[in-house]
């Protein structure tokens, strides 16, 4: 067994270093996971470009999977074994605050990306490392997918929480604004819940993929008015659910126009910059529409996400665009 582990450390804007540190000793209640793959999330991209501010030095990575290679003496052997392939949850809820105790870990009052993790040389979530010490509470069995596909577990769990928050019903018309990976995952899950999905994006390569994945309609808002197209498709009723997966406040303000009476607008993305928007309170009163926010995921969502992938209910192969070795980090981030 190697004695040294490797990790990527953000040291400043557009500055990353590959560092070595001793592979941590396994404490009584933890397991040692050798990381097989970690996806680069938009969050880490924003840290890299300086849009998201963190205290340096910082270790990113929260979409990772790997194998258990060593277990502490108190770890339940009925549940875990060396060699198990696992998805790792490191969104780091405290599990003690009111929200966590109420089953809403995704809204933990003390949520902190920058905690110091046991065994790591710097603060951060730590997924962009070769080895991690993890509590079994944050491990989830996964099977029948490649490590690269399995890294989609965490984003899928977040989208699953979003879709369940929207309470989509069979026959609903759902508008998904933004066809990046999060928008495409919203598209897939909405279809699985029996919805007719309209996607909206100025990138027609992305909307083409959304149509291939099962979306019924695609709108390019640079060429067409989204509200008018939604009214045309729905006979004037508009959409029961609108998901905004973009980080742009103006898009969220415009998204309101496509929501039906008694419909739901779900704001999924973080907004950069966080510019206030204008919404008519009288429209909200008369339409009985609901404005909903959703962020992160909880243990239940993570468990469901691993089942969706392991059982082949959701195919995420189209979302694995490039694969890099840890040493190729500069190329990966650029």
Which residues make up each language-model segment?
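Glycine-rich phosphate-binding loop and adjacent beta-alpha segment
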Residues: 249-311
């Amino acid at each position: 067994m190697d004695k040294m582990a490797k990790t990527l450390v953000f040291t400043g804007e557009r500055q990353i270093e590959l560092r070595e540190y001793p592979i941590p000793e396994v404490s009584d209640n933890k397991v040692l996971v050798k990381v097989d793959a970690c996806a680069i999330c938009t969050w880490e991209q924003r840290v890299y470009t300086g849009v998201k501010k963190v205290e340096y030095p910082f270790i990113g990575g929260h979409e990772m999977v790997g194998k258990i290679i060593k277990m502490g003496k108190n770890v339940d052997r009925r549940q875990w074994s060396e060699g198990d392939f696992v998805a790792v949850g490191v969104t780091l809820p405290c599990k003690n605050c009111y929200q966590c105790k109420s089953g809403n870990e995704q809204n933990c009052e003390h949520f902190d990306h920058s905690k110091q993790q046991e065994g790591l040389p710097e603060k951060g979530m730590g997924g962009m490392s070769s080895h991690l010490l993890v509590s079994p509470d944050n491990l989830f069995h996964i099977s029948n997918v490649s490590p690269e596909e399995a890294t989609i577990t965490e984003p899928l769990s977040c989208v699953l929480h979003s879709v369940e928050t929207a309470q989509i019903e069979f026959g609903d018309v759902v508008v998904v604004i933004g066809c990046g990976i999060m928008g495409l995952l919203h598209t897939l899950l909405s279809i699985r819940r029996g919805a007719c999905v309209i996607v909206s994006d100025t990138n027609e390569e992305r909307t083409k993929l959304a149509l291939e994945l099962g979306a019924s309609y695609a709108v390019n808002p640079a060429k067409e008015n989204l509200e008018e197209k939604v009214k045309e498709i729905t006979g004037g009723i508009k959409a029961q659910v609108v998901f905004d997966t973009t980080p742009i406040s103006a898009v969220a303000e415009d998204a309101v126009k496509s929501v039906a009476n008694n419909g739901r607008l779900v704001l999924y993305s973080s907004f950069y910059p966080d510019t206030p928007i204008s919404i008519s309170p009288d429209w909200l009163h008369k339409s009985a529409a609901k404005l909903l926010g959703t962020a992160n995921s909880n243990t239940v969502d993570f468990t469901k996400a691993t089942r969706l992938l392991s059982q082949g209910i959701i195919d995420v192969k189209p979302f694995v665009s490039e694969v890099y070795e840890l040493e190729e980090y500069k190329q990966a981030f650029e």
